[in-house]
């Protein structure tokens, strides 16, 4: 990532992604733990999660739209 904004190492990103996979919202305690583990500030963790949730929402919206366009797969009544 060039220009403004924080760049994260591959390891940090992987760990954050892994955590996000299990919880989209972090407790403060978990955030502190992650900040220590990844050598980031709590604020950086918080912002990463906010951005990740936005991206997730956008991706999900696209997914549900394409599902609808595909004729709502999975809604077959007998």
UniProtKB/Swiss-Prot annotation:
One MF term in the entry's GO annotations: RNA polymerase II cis-regulatory region sequence-specific DNA binding
SUPFAM superfamilies the record matches: Homeodomain-like (SSF46689)
Pfam family, one: Homeodomain
Annotated keywords: Developmental protein, DNA-binding, Homeobox, Nucleus, Transcription, Transcription regulation
GO biological process: anterior/posterior pattern specification
Annotated GO CC locations: nucleus
Residue spans binding DNA: 1-60
Record's subcellular location: Nucleus
Classification via CDD domains: homeodomain
InterPro entries, alphabetized: Antp_homeobox (IPR050296), HD (IPR001356), HD_metazoa (IPR020479), Homeobox_CS (IPR017970), Homeodomain-like_sf (IPR009057)
Gene3D superfamilies: Homeodomain-like
Family of this protein: Belongs to the Antp homeobox family.
Role noted for this protein: Sequence-specific transcription factor which is part of a developmental regulatory system that provides cells with specific positional identities on the anterior-posterior axis.
Official protein name in the record: Homeobox protein Hox-A5
Native species: Salmo salar
Highest classification ranks of the organism: Eukaryota, Metazoa, Chordata, Craniata, Vertebrata
């Amino acid at each position: 990532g060039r220009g403004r904004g924080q760049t994260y190492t591959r390891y940090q990103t992987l760990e954050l992604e892994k955590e996000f996979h299990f919880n989209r919202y972090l407790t403060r305690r978990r955030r502190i733990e992650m900040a220590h583990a990844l050598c980031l500030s709590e604020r950086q963790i918080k912002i990463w999660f906010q951005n990740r949730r936005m991206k997730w929402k956008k991706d999900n919206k696209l997914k549900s739209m394409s599902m609808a366009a595909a004729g709502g797969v999975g809604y077959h009544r007998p």
